[in-house]
Amino acid sequence: MNKENKQELVAEMHDKLQRAQAVFLADFRGMNVGQATELRNELRKANAEYKVVKNTLLEIASKGTDKEGLNPYYAGPTAIALCYDDPVAAAKVLSRFNKENTNPFTLKAGVLTGKTINVADIQALADLPSREVLIAKMLGSMQAPASNFVRVLAAVPGGFVRALDAIRAQKEA
């Protein structure tokens, strides 16, 4: 790769690092080409991207971004997963893929909203419910008091109607 191509790659990676909401690094030793392709496809479905880039180029590309905290982890064979949408979905894909394929890679570290996170944090992120589930739970908890209030208001006239019906039935008998 000549100097011009490297500069283009660094500029492209710098842009991608700035746009990414989360970034995960992995040591991909033990992963074959078929597994890498499968992982790329799965991450693409989660609006994430999987790339293998030289460590020195990643280090240069991360300068001036909130991903500079990853610089100590650019050692050995390094793959990078860039998440542009939901970091939880990408972390779930990485975790599930690693379990299903007998550990083809080892997670090193990541960055989430500018903060460097370790492997345990990435696993905790993967264990969270999906974004849709969290939103549904939040909306359900916000809606519960209002629906309970409506139910109480509806019960008062309903009780009154049942009492009148009981009095009517008693007078008819």
Swiss-Prot record:
Pfam families: Ribosomal_L10 (PF00466)
Keywords, in A-Z order: Ribonucleoprotein, Ribosomal protein, RNA-binding, rRNA-binding
InterPro entries, alphabetized: Ribosomal_uL10 (IPR001790), Ribosomal_uL10-like_sf (IPR043141), Ribosomal_uL10_bac (IPR022973), Ribosomal_uL10_bac_type (IPR047865), Ribosomal_uL10_CS_bac (IPR002363)
Listed GO CC annotations: large ribosomal subunit
GO molecular function: large ribosomal subunit rRNA binding; structural constituent of ribosome
Any one of the GO BP annotations: translation
Keyword check for Ribosomal protein: yes
Family (UniProt): Belongs to the universal ribosomal protein uL10 family.
Subunit organization: Part of the ribosomal stalk of the 50S ribosomal subunit. The N-terminus interacts with L11 and the large rRNA to form the base of the stalk. The C-terminus forms an elongated spine to which L12 dimers bind in a sequential fashion forming a multimeric L10(L12)X complex.
Purpose of the protein: Forms part of the ribosomal stalk, playing a central role in the interaction of the ribosome with GTP-bound translation factors.
Protein name listed in UniProt: Large ribosomal subunit protein uL10
The species this protein was found in: Citrifermentans bemidjiense (strain ATCC BAA-1014 / DSM 16622 / JCM 12645 / Bem)
This protein's encoding gene: rplJ
